[in-house]
Each structure stands twice: as C-alpha cells, then as structure tokens.
Design a protein with these regions (language model features):
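Transmembrane alpha-helices of multi-pass inner-membrane enzymes
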Residues: 67-68, 260-265, 382-392, 399-451, ...
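Membrane-embedded alpha-helical segments of multi-pass membrane proteins
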Residues: 8-17, 42, 55-72, 122-130, ...
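Hydrophobic transmembrane alpha-helices and their immediate junctions
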Residues: 219, 264, 346-392, 422
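Long extracytoplasmic/lumenal interhelical loops at the membrane interface
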Residues: 172-173, 184, 275-277, 282-348, ...
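Membrane-interface catalytic loops of GT-C/OST-like multi-pass glycosylation enzymes that act
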Residues: 51, 235-238, 333-334, 398-408
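Alpha-helical transmembrane segments of multi-pass inner-membrane proteins
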Residues: 3, 16-24, 92-96, 100, ...
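Membrane-interface junctions at the ends of membrane-embedded or membrane-associated helices
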Residues: 73-80, 137-147, 210-216, 419-439
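N-terminal hydrophobic segments of proteins, predominantly signal-anchor/transmembrane helices
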Residues: 24-50, 55-126
C-alpha cells in the first residue's frame, strides 16, 4: 500500500517551478534551468500539472523567466555569438508565414490565438530553438555544462524507469504490438520514445568514447546499458537504423574499431538479437509473396499521396501544420516521413530551409570537435554531430522533430555546443579561470546527481 505522498508530488513540483522561475528573474537561473531540463521528456509528468493555474505552460514559464533574467542583468552579451542564429530566424519566419498560408488553404480562423491548434503547435515548435538560446546563455563554464549533462542523464533515467515499470511482467519472448509502450514520453508514441532513446544512446556513447574520468564513464555505462535495453524492446525499426547510422558516423572519427562491431551486428543480427526483436525486423516483409507488411505498406501509400499533393504546391506548399487536418488517407494525420511532410506543407523552400538548418547544426558540432583542445568539449561536439545524423535518419520514418519530449534534448545540447564553441576560442589561461579543469569536471560528475536532486526538491 502506498504512502499517499504521491498525490502531493505535482503540487510540490508546481511550487518549485514558480519559486525557481521567480528566482531566475533576479538572475539566479540554475534551479529553473535544471527543472526545465529535467521535465523536457517527461510529458505525462507535465500533464499532471495542468490542473494548476498556468500548469500547462510550465515549460514556457521556465524558459521565459530564465531568458528575461539574463536579458535584465546582462543584455544580449549573455548569449554567445554563433553562426546558427540566422538559420533559426529563417526557420521561424518561414514557418510563421506558412502558418498564415495554411489558414487560407484550409479556410480556418487566422492563427492569432493560442486556442488555435495550429498556432499553438507552431508556438510549441518555436519554443525549442529558444531553449537552445536559453541554455547557451545560462551555461557559462564547462563545469556548468557538466551539470546540465548530469540532469539530462537523470531525466533519461526516469524515462527508462517508466518503460521498465510499464512493461514489467510482460513476456518478451515473442513480438506483439501489446508489448510496445511509450512510458512518460506520452502522446509522441512508442516510435517517439524509441527515437528519444536512439538520440541519447548515440550522444552519450560518443561522450563515453571521448571523455575519460572513471566516475563519469561508469555513470554513462550504466545509463547506456538500460537505454539499449529500452531501445531494443521499443521495437522501432526506424530507431534501430537511426542508431546504427549515428554510431557509424561517430566511429569514423573516434572509434574505428566500433565499425567492426557494427558490421558484425549487421551480418549476424539473427544470431545475437532477442527473438522478439528479430521477429519485429522480419515483419517488414511478410507473407509467402514477400510483400510489405500492412504498416509499411500504409507508409508507402501515404508517401505516394503526399507527393501528389506536393506537386500541386511545389514552391511554398499548402501551409504549416495543414496535413493533419486533411485526412486524405484513412485516419492518418501524418505522412510518416517528416521530410515528405515538410515538402507538402512548406514546399521546396521549406525543405531546403530545414535541411540546411539540420546540416548547419551538425557542422557546428563537428567544428567544436576539431577546434576544442580537451576531450570533454570534443566529446560534446562529436556527440552532437552524431546525434544530428541519428535525427536526420530517424525523421525519414516519421515526425521526430516537432515533439518537445522527443527532441528537446537536441536543442539543449545545441545550446551546450554554442557555448562550447565560444569556450574553445578562449586562451587556455582564461578557460582555466572559468574553473573547467579536468579534475574539477570529474568532481562535478560525482556530485551532480545529488545536486540535481536537491535543486528539484528545494
């Protein structure tokens, strides 16, 4: 029998959000930042706060309070210079213009109210680049960057635990759709959950390869072990492929021996993978005539229909966030390929804008890897680039780009890369004055879990 304390947890969390947000307005952003990062993938946890005043807007309250606090105390100097800003501005302007186009295309109300579903979707999409900017402004040193990563690790551990708890007692000896569960990721679905885990595996595996402090590496090994388990039994073929693509890219730069292991897995997967996972992979083609199984065949139908629609508006598309309201193929509201969706809704211009942004983000991480002279920043840079390769592939199988709980950490890590790129340019003496020596970071790795827990309960 439970203690009954669980009923007070949402209230305690809500009060912590309010207190930390008020504190952030006066320039003390650490608590608000940690709570913001911790809650990003925990969609069902955030849902429990919606009964409180502005409870559905806690993510906005947190990032806005941090942003306003930084601007009041330091102005624009709080944020590092970065070549990524023009690309983010281009994305926001294009999608907002396309949002209005979509209203005329659908014949609906103009997107000027938060109660409008399409405007709300666009606003939630734009929150993610703002989170990157907020992280880049609030995180000033390598030690603070380590704290951010440890909160990300702690939040991921909760995501993994929710999967274990939800699937406890289920028989994984053979595949069944009933085995699949999204845990706290919520409405992004099990494929969104799998994509989230894939991104985590690629990034932290890279950091494990590059960064040597034993305590930090042990923490990563434990998390990666649980994450790989979750990835396997999420039964997402797209996530499997995206993970292999990201790890293969990383292996070329820092762990070429890993390529041998990946090649062996590709060749011998029927010998080493669990039976249920093998059955899921083999389902792609089924039946005596070796035709596509129903879900894969439905995707092909969706893509063909979407491409026909794209041809009617090839330059600017039908408008941002319009496809889900058309119901052109059965009950589906998504093309199950994000690039196809972008082509349909924002046309060739939108696709070029998106792909250019994705590649520029990946290149920013790769630049940090080559320019940094310490293993920690190198690991963050290469890990982020590998993560972007994983994301590029994952979005071929559905929308893994506009859900905060799925790819919110991409933007958090982009903020770290933006700040890391500035740190890498400083003279060695300046960076030492910032307190980023290797032994200090190792000490922070030992203490960050307890500090994050204290911050979240203060």
């Amino acid at each position: 029998m439970g203690s009954g304390l669980g009923t007070y947890i949402p209230l305690a969390l809500y009060l912590a959000v309010l207190a930390s947000s008020l504190r952030a307005l006066f320039g003390k952003s650490d608590l608000a930042l940690y709570i913001l990062l911790f809650l990003i993938p925990l969609q069902t946890t955030r849902y429990r706060l919606e009964g409180f005043f502005l409870g559905s807007e806690i993510i906005d309250i947190l990032w806005l309070s941090i942003f306003v606090g930084l601007m009041l105390r330091q102005g624009t100097s709080a944020f590092p210079k970065s070549p990524i800003y023009p690309y983010l501005i281009a994305l926001s302007l294009l999608t907002y213009f396309s949002l209005w186009m979509g209203s005329f295309y659908l014949g609906t109300d103009l997107p000027i109210r938060l109660s409008d579903t399409r405007f709300s979707d666009w606003k939630n999409y734009m929150v993610m680049p703002m989170i990157a900017i907020v992280v880049a402004g609030a995180v000033r040193t390598k030690v603070e960057m380590t704290r951010v990563l440890m909160v990300v690790l702690a939040s991921t551990a909760v995501v993994n635990w929710s999967f274990f708890r939800s699937t406890n007692g289920r028989d994984f000896s053979h595949f069944s759709y009933d085995l699949r569960d999204a845990g706290v990721i919520g409405y992004a679905g099990v494929n969104g959950f799998a994509a989230f885990i894939a991104l985590i595996v690629v990034f932290f595996a890279t950091l494990l390869f590059c960064y040597k402090p034993k305590v930090f590496r042990l923490t990563l090994l434990v998390l990666l072990g649980f994450s790989v388990y979750c990835l396997l039994f999420a039964f997402s073929r797209g996530a499997y492929f995206a993970t292999l693509a990201g790890l293969s890219f990383v292996a070329v730069f820092c762990q070429k021996k890993l390529l041998i292991g990946i090649a062996a897995l590709v060749i011998c997967w029927q010998l080493v993978l669990p039976q249920a996972v093998q059955e899921r992979i083999n389902m792609t083609y089924g039946g005596s005539d070796n035709t596509l199984e129903p879900s894969a065949a439905d995707r092909v139908t969706l893509w063909e229909d979407a491409m026909n629609l794209y041809k009617t508006n090839p330059v600017l598309g039908t408008g941002y966030d319009t496809y889900q309201f058309m119901h052109r193929v059965a009950e589906y509201g998504d093309t199950h390929n994000y690039y196809v969706k972008v082509m349909v809704e924002t046309g060739t211009v939108g696709l070029i804008t998106l792909v250019t942004l994705l590649l520029r983000m990946a290149f920013l991480g790769l630049q940090l890897y080559f320019k940094a002279d310490d293993s920690f920043l190198k690991g963050i840079g290469l890990g982020f680039c590998g993560l972007m390769v994983c994301a590029l592939v994952a979005n071929c199988f559905g929308d893994r780009w506009t859900y905060l709980q799925v790819d919110g950490f991409i933007w958090v890590l982009l903020g770290c890369v933006m700040r890391g790129s500035e740190l890498a340019k400083r003279p060695e003496t300046t960076r030492e004055a910032d307190g980023i020596a290797e032994d200090e970071v190792a000490r922070m790795a030992r203490n960050s879990f307890s500090e994050a827990g204290t911050c979240l309960t203060t």
